[in-house]
Amino acid sequence: MSSGIILLIVAIVLLVIIAYLVGVIIRKRNDSLITSLEERKQALFALPVNDEIEEVKSLHLIGQSQTSFREWNQKWVDLTVNSFADIENHIFEAENLNDTFNFIRAKHEINSVESQLNLVEEDIASIREALNILKEQEEKNSARVTHALDLYEKLQASISENEDNFGSTMPEIDKQMKNIETEFSQFVALNSSGDPVEASEVLDRAEEHTIALGQITEQIPAIVAKLEDDFPDQLDDLETGYRRLLEENYHFPEKNIEARFQEIRESIRANSSELVTLDLDRAREENAHIQERIDSLYEVFEREIAAYKVAAKNSKMLPRYLAHVKRNNEQLKDEIARLSRKYILSETESLTVKAFEKDIKEIEDSTLAVAEQFGLQEKPFSELQVTFERSIKTLTNVESGQMDVFAAVKDIEKIESQARHNLDVYVTQLHMIKRYMEKRHLPGIPQDFLSAFFTTSSQLEALMDELSRGRINIEAVSRLSEVATVAIANLEDLTYQVVQNATLTEQLLQYSNRYRSFEAGVQSSFEHALRLFEVENDYQASFDEISYALETVEPGVTDRFVNSYEKTREHIRF
């Protein structure tokens, strides 16, 4: 056998071996893929879809939800009956083809199974998602229904427990409860008939009406309590108090109190009747108005009770106070009459006392008898309180005025005595001032001093003349005495100033001799000052002239002389 044939045979054998090995490898790979697909199929088939379906089925769905559930359930049945069986057949076919080394057809079957599994996997995911949505939706709807029913049942229980607190509103509340119950029945009917949208709207309305009625029923008892308990109790209290006050001789400026009681009772009945409409804002507003009217009656009674205490106290005080003020006025009249015999008094005091007497007489005529017969009066105590307080205020003003007049006249005699004493002192001082000036031996007396001296003398003479009259004008005496006091003080000051200017001028004129010979200004001022001093007797101008000249040559010299003079100045000995 030739070597060429041998090589050909070896090549064929090698190709067969290689082909066999490749076939074995492909077959094992396909076996692995088929096993993987089988596992995917088993995993999908093992998903708890049946349990989930049974769970949703147990919710007893109705209407559109039930229809949707049936569709998804049928789809699952189709998958389990048809799709899984078909996949199983294709897997079996792929295994046979792979075992017989029909790899191309086997691969085709494997790809087909994989595509089917992908579709089934998607379908199962859709089914499970739809079931979950149905479950959540049903649970949500169930929770809404349960919540709404719980609200209704709680409201029903609350109304039953507090039925007595709703008064005239109970029939309307029962009517509203029946309407809500009807809405729940309507919801069930619509939901069962497959109209979930309309059913949901009805459920919303039922829940809203339940909540609204619950809020209303929470507020009604307080309003009813006012109408059925508080207001009647307050009215009974007012009427009882009113009768008791009438028995105790109370009178009221308001003449329609009985009618006001009746009007309030009618308002209570009317508001109670209107409350059946459940218009709580209006009912509360009317209750507030009723309370205001009741409070106003309380204020009337409390005002009269408080006024009685004040009026009773003032009725006892007024007669005593009136007698006291009247005695004061008589004493004041007597004192003014006594003083009028010696003094000319201002007409103000007499007119004021007459005005006091008029006020006292008016109170005696209009109020005294009322106070003395206080227990028999048929007027409201508030009016009596005002009357007594006005009279007491008048008496207080009268008494205060009496004190002012008394203070004005009580010192008249002291004023006269003091004026006489001052006159004697001032006359003596005038003579002493005159002697003091004479002892100074001045070249002459300044004209302003002479004018002040004679003016003061005239003022003292006027005071002396006024005190010498048969009836002294005490106002004139007071005025003249004050004028004389000021005049004598001014004259004393002027006296000291004149003497000081004259003395210091003499001293400075003498002191200027040391500068006159060589200071022309000092010489000129000396001559001018000397003329003012000896001829014109203007000591102030003379002092100013010479002191100014000396200050120009010897600053401070004037102050030195002034200080020295003030230490040794001779005072007027009064």
From Swiss-Prot:
Residues 102-141, 274-350, 459-520 form a coiled coil. It is a single-pass membrane protein. It comes from the Bacteria. Residues 27-574 are cytoplasmic. Residues 1-7 are extracellular. The keyword Cell cycle applies. The keyword Cell membrane applies. The chain crosses the membrane at residues 8-26. One of its GO terms (biological process) is septin ring assembly. GO terms for cellular component: plasma membrane; septin ring. Keywords: Cell cycle, Cell division, Cell membrane, Coiled coil, Membrane, Septation, Transmembrane, Transmembrane helix. Belongs to the EzrA family. NCBIfam families: PRK04778.1-1, PRK04778.1-4. Negative regulator of FtsZ ring formation; modulates the frequency and position of FtsZ ring formation. Inhibits FtsZ ring formation at polar sites. Interacts either with FtsZ or with one of its binding partners to promote depolymerization. This is Septation ring formation regulator EzrA. It comes from Streptococcus pyogenes serotype M2 (strain MGAS10270). The lineage of its organism: Bacteria, Bacillati, Bacillota, Bacilli, Lactobacillales.
